[in-house]
């Protein structure tokens, strides 16, 4: 029976509320016939860590995360900690950098067909949307040299990218596309008509797929036309989307509104391709923030957090059947109408979590 070491960062505000529901799901698996055991290690991150330790991420918590099989994160940040010298966001940036989570995965899909009506897009436009955005997470403009405005009214950000960085994330996208049944197309987004780094990006991605994934379809879109296409005909992007840090940050937020609630979509940030040959640690978290306006009210949607567990089982733990069971349990509960207010229901956070745990327990018998 494999035992997996899982570090849990509840984080701030509604973060601990959703991780509490995730732990219910892990407890069900732990006590089922799945022959899987979890060693849960809770630690502080973000504002909670600042309050307790004066820093957003302690060396002890970082070491635990790096040594773990996977990391679960609720959400961090909030107005209490402002924009001062020590900020919650510094903790997650350090965590990503030190763990080396170079690939951020944000799938866009409907957890249940019944949710199509919650989308801001027309049903005939969004029905059948199913793509996975792979964002390069540790390079690009967020990590380039910068010059702050010193009062002169002038500032500079630079976007560096190396061929090796682009090759690595392109291979991750190719692996994910190849793992689908049947293999799906890959869409690379750039701004090659203007930016030198984008021209390097396009050439490198083209070379990787020609040499290493010749059986896959690879297409290229300029980021601005892709942003338009995502609203006009998002199914045209079904498959795997791969793009740079900045473009991925923006386009994944655009995609996040398609299912109708931020509380529905999971994410993963991976340290390696999940090929089963080497360790693939990852940070698994919902795409929503800490939502201080609703924290403590018991109304935050735990679905995104629980679906993130499914991604954890699929990628870091190499337990694809468990991942399918988690997704199925979530779908069944949504279709039974046990939903939080953001998707038209009246259930509380804990009620949804309890229902999913109970459904999963039945599926694992």
Curated annotation (Swiss-Prot):
Q: Name one GO cellular component term.
A: cytosol
UniProt subcellular location: Cytoplasm
Q: What class of enzyme is it?
A: oxidoreductase
Which cofactors, if any, are listed as required?
A: Mg(2+); Mn(2+)
Write down the SMART domains for this protein, in alphabetical order. Iso_dh
Which residues bind NAD(+) per the record? 78-89, 289-301
Record pathway:
Amino-acid biosynthesis; L-leucine biosynthesis; L-leucine from 3-methyl-2-oxobutanoate: step 3/4
- Amino-acid positions noted as binding Mg(2+) in the UniProt annotation, renumbered to this chain: 224, 249, 253
Reply yes or no: does the keyword Transferase apply: no
State the Gene3D superfamilies in the record: Isopropylmalate Dehydrogenase
Quote the catalytic activity from the record: (2R,3S)-3-isopropylmalate + NAD(+) = 4-methyl-2-oxopentanoate + CO2 + NADH
Single biological process term from Gene Ontology: L-leucine biosynthetic process
Keywords from UniProt, A to Z, are: Amino-acid biosynthesis, Branched-chain amino acid biosynthesis, Cytoplasm, Leucine biosynthesis, Magnesium, Manganese, Metal-binding, NAD, Oxidoreductase
Instruction: List the residue(s) that the UniProt entry marks as the site Important for catalysis.
Output: 142, 191
InterPro entries attached here?
IsoCit/isopropylmalate_DH_CS, IsoPropMal-DH-like_dom, Isopropylmalate_DH
A GO term, aspect molecular function: 3-isopropylmalate dehydrogenase activity
- Principal subcellular localization: cytoplasm
Name the Enzyme Commission number(s) assigned to this protein: 1.1.1.85
**Alphabetized Pfam families for the sequence:** Iso_dh
Q: Which SUPFAM superfamilies match?
A: Isocitrate/Isopropylmalate dehydrogenase-like
Q: How is the cofactor bound?
A: Binds 1 Mg(2+) or Mn(2+) ion per subunit.
Q: Which NCBIfam families match?
A: leuB
> Subunit comment for this entry?
Homodimer.
Q: What does this protein do?
A: Catalyzes the oxidation of 3-carboxy-2-hydroxy-4-methylpentanoate (3-isopropylmalate) to 3-carboxy-4-methyl-2-oxopentanoate. The product decarboxylates to 4-methyl-2 oxopentanoate.
**The protein's name:** 3-isopropylmalate dehydrogenase
Protein's organism: Zymoseptoria tritici (Speckled leaf blotch fungus)
């Amino acid at each position: 029976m494999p035992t997996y070491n899982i570090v849990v960062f509840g984080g701030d505000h509604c973060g601990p509320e959703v991780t509490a529901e995730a732990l219910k799901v892990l407890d069900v698996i732990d006590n089922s016939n799945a022959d899987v055991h979890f060693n849960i290690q809770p630690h502080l991150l973000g504002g909670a860590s600042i309050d307790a330790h004066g820093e957003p991420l302690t060396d002890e918590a970082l070491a635990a995360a790096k040594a773990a099989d996977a990391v679960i994160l609720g959400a961090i940040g909030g107005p209490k900690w402002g924009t001062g010298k020590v900020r919650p966001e510094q903790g997650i940036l350090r965590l990503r950098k030190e763990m080396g989570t170079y690939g951020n995965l944000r799938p866009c899909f409907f957890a249940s067909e019944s949710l199509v009506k919650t989308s801001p897009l027309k049903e005939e436009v969004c029905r059948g949307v199913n793509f996975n955005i792979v964002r390069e997470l540790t390079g690009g403009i967020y990590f380039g040299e910068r010059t702050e405005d010193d009062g002169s009214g002038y500032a500079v950000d630079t976007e560096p990218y190396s061929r090796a960085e682009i090759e690595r994330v392109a291979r991750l996208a190719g692996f994910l596309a190849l793992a689908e049944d049947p293999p799906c197309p890959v869409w690379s987004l750039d701004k090659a008509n203007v930016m030198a780094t984008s021209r390097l990006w396009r050439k490198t991605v083209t070379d990787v797929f020609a040499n290493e994934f010749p059986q896959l379809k690879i297409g290229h879109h300029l980021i601005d036309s892709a942003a338009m296409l995502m609203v006009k005909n998002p199914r045209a992007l079904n498959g795997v989307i791969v793009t740079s840090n900045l473009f991925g940050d923006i386009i994944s937020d655009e995609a996040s509104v398609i299912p109708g609630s931020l509380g529905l979509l999971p994410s993963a940030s991976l340290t390696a391709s999940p090929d089963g040959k080497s360790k693939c640690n990852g940070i698994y978290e919902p795409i929503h923030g800490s939502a201080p306006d609703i924290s403590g009210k018991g109304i935050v949607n735990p679905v995104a957090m629980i679906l993130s567990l499914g991604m954890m089982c699929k990628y870091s733990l190499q337990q694809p059947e468990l991942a399918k069971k988690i997704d199925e349990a979530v779908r069944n509960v949504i279709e039974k109408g046990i939903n939080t207010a953001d998707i038209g229901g009246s259930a509380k956070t804990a009620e949804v979590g309890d229902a999913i745990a109970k459904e999963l327990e039945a599926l694992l018998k």
